[in-house]
Amino acid sequence: MNALQDQHVLILGLGASGLAMARWCARCGARVTVADTRSAPPQLAALQRELPAAQFISGAFDAALVVGTDVRAVFKSPGLSPLDVATVIEAANTIGIRATGELGLFSQALADLKATQNYTPKVLAVTGTNGKTTVTALTGLLVERGGKSVAVAGNIGPTLLDTLIQHLAAGTLPEVWVIELSSFQLEGETGFEPSAAAVLNITQDHLDWHGSMAAYVAAKAHVFGATGLMILNREDPQVMAMLPEPVRVKLQRPQLRAHVTFGADLPRRPGDFGLEQVNGMLWLVRALEADETLKNRKGETPELFLQRLMPADALRIRGRHNAVNALAALALAQAAGCALGPMLYGLRDYRGEPHRVAPIGIFNEVEFFDDSKGTNVGATVAALAGLGSERKVIVILGGEGKGQDFAPLVDPVSRYARAVVLIGRDAPLLRAALQATHVPLLEAESMAQAVALANAQAHAGDAVLLSPACASFDMFDNYEHRAQVFAQAVGELASAAGAAWEGAAP
């Protein structure tokens, strides 16, 4: 691991990933300079304490950071958009300096470990607009239950490089890495080669950062590399469009790249995963060839046998969208060679991630769900469809809309919502978009008022869902704070009503 030895490296941005890259580069013997447009970025004290030899530069990101210096590599923090660092990256490219990010450093580290220690772990990667954290955490649990050592890292932490440093120090390099990757981390990365990768879905998000939907989709597609198994949501046309055209081989059928699909419908190919309704019960299923000993004629579709894995009701995570998340996790863990039986027990035990359609309690036969992490339209569409397949939903929407198109909410609100309560800065935009649904649209000035209005609209057996489809910063510190205020409001409402409160205390 001496590619960085005695090299001068420049790190752009001093957040969690920037600090992790600085630690890694210093560990590898590099001379480190960190630049940030802020005079006191959040990790500056940690950098100065842990790496006193590192230089910190505050100011604009301009070409002078690399031109006329002895910098030999530039590493960009994922929070910085291409526009933020364009001047530096273009200057670096012009003079032949490599520029990458934490994922590129992590990939190089694994290549070095393979060369020096014959370390060849399976690497499973997860991306998509929504569901990444749930599928990443669940895949890690399934791999562990499948009997393999595993490290889970990436987008929301811990960072890839800090996790690698910890395992190297402890002598516990895992057999499998499960990593969550955002479009920010994947932007511009071309050397990443996972064993298998999943794209869960694609809906509008971060367009202000990427500049266009096409650029956002292209960044997500980098997750597959050139050779890894592709795990694809077959119900999402933009995801399926990532599958390359078949390669024509002389005297053979055109060869499709290795892939597995999943979705809420029936699987169509051997090895694919899906959902099947049997006598009113929804099952997780996998398609197998009915008779693998029979060779199919050219162009003939193999006869399928659907292997029922477990009822969706046996999952602790709620909603059809979470059943689909479970299928994606099964496909990923299976790609790492994990046995199916132990993984199914793991699925039953998984309780979900905080603020992602998380049940927080029931009173007066109405169940309350916290999906405060639903900060974009796609997340809320999935939450409504997931919960609405079983009951009517009163949904709390609103906040900072980030310039999104709210039109995709019209269909699920029309189908699944009994009422909508609007909060926050972009409530008027949501009202305009949802007017055609003819569902009651109420407005609240505070979360407490929103909860009270939602509860008043609910019937026994309904769900009240906080899934704002918007960022939180107009009214709250962050989405966790929004969730905390929601839970507190629900608890206070139950107490004031003198109702029995079944579930988590706020």
From Swiss-Prot:
GO terms for cellular component: cytoplasm. It comes from the Bacteria. The keyword Cytoplasm applies. GO terms for biological process: cell division; cell wall organization; peptidoglycan biosynthetic process; regulation of cell shape. Cell wall formation. Catalyzes the addition of glutamate to the nucleotide precursor UDP-N-acetylmuramoyl-L-alanine (UMA). HAMAP family: MurD. This is UDP-N-acetylmuramoylalanine--D-glutamate ligase. It comes from Albidiferax ferrireducens (strain ATCC BAA-621 / DSM 15236 / T118) (Rhodoferax ferrireducens).
